[in-house]
């Protein structure tokens, strides 16, 4: 699909084969934080659970498993938790002597928000359309305190793309035919 907003606000469909998805692109404001952005799209959502992603993470999250867990949990929001590997290796030490090197283990107990979420429309009650509303602060913290925030623990591949280094790593995986997130033919 090509969207051409330069003159005629035209959409061109290049192939007739498509998933049964509804995609809405909304300008929520250049300086609007994450919570304000979600609140500003409320009128497009409807009454069903919806999926949200930040768009700067690449993963092989099983979206069906995420959705099924969300539905069975009764939570308002279910986020995908991941355990990122350490960026730096760990030194094994005995006193002032290095005795070995190893990668930082994922299993150090720390989980982070991987950025793939399922939300019930009830989440809008926790959000403000103001530019400064940050989803990860007051809204998600309130849901957590109320026991309404769930986690889907994703054991598979996840990589953020925040830096040129991240971009280069992901491109290297793709170009080498080792992209765990690739589904189907491209």
Each language-model region and where it sits:
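Conserved N-terminal catalytic core of the sugar/cofactor nucleotidyltransferase
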Residues: 1-54, 65, 163
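Residue-level detector of conserved, well-ordered beta-strand and adjacent loop positions
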Residues: 26, 94, 102
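Short beta-strand-to-loop element that shapes/binds the nucleotide-sugar donor at the catalytic cleft/hinge
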Residues: 77-95
